[in-house]
Amino acid sequence: MNQKLTPSLYRLLLTAALIIAVHTQPTEVAAAEKKFDRSPKNLGSVLVFSGTGWYRHPEVPALSGWLARRDKDLRMQVDVSENPADLVKILNRYKVLVLNNCTEMPALLDEKQRQAVEEWHAAGGGIVALHAALVRQTEWKWFNELAGCDFDSDSEFLEARVVVDPAAAKHPTVSGHGTSFKYTADWTNHDRSVSGIKGFQVLLRVDESSYEPVRELFQKRGGKAMGKDHPIAWLNTNGGGRFFYTELGHDVRSLETPFGKQHIVEAIRWAAGLKPTSSK
């Protein structure tokens, strides 16, 4: 049935709409402000940064979500950003910066933003770098030295034999899994090994004889395997703060395992200077 919209009916409907708008707008605005509130009282201890300057893997957002959902395991609030400006504005309020596959940061971050990260780390901030966070970083000398190496090539998503460094057997990020174990991930080859660098401690290596270390794409481009000494997770305690890197984190499936969760949760707590979750 079609009813003609008379002037009086139109005024009535308009008045009703204005009343509804007046009463609902403050609530909606307040909810939005609360959702995006970045005041110190509403910030957590961990900032997951997922900005990228080069290739951006489609699973980066899913990984940020996965990391945010580790808050209960971590016993720490986790915030997420991909805005480089946040590294200047709010980084100093956090204990840990997680670099979620942040490729080629020199192309993404300006000098002021890079300096903010350097000063924050020198003052004791902890950095946890995942997988592609060591891709194309050589133009940022400070970060390249902090990480110890850069990207060369990688494998397909394959099962491989992972070996725990004997000196690291009790470290909370790798403990409880014996001297070696099988694990499936995308394994990265670096342009050098960090073994023996002062201040670095290798936690895990991958046995290249247990998988094909260079996938076909990179074989055609001259990609090289690392050989017998292929670190895949390590620490660096040089420079004031703590640094942790792991090759895991190409996508969620490489982390959504008991070991993957332990590895990342304990890495973040270690970077924050906190005791392992197993400690009372």
Task: Give the location of each predicted region.
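Aromatic-Pro/Gly-enriched surface loop or interdomain linker
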Residues: 31-94, 276
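Extracellular ligand-binding/catalytic regions of CAZymes and related secreted enzymes
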Residues: 32-44, 69, 73, 92, ...
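Bacterial N-terminal signal peptides
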Residues: 11-25
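Short alpha-beta junction capping motif
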Residues: 45-49, 91-137, 240
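Boundary at the C-terminal end of the N-terminal hydrophobic targeting segment
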Residues: 24-32
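N-terminal secretory signal peptides that target proteins for export/translocation
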Residues: 1-8
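Solvent-exposed loop/turn segments at secondary-structure junctions
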Residues: 52-55, 84-87, 102-107, 127, ...
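Catalytic beta-strand/loop cores that center a nucleophilic Ser/Cys/Thr
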Residues: 149, 154-239
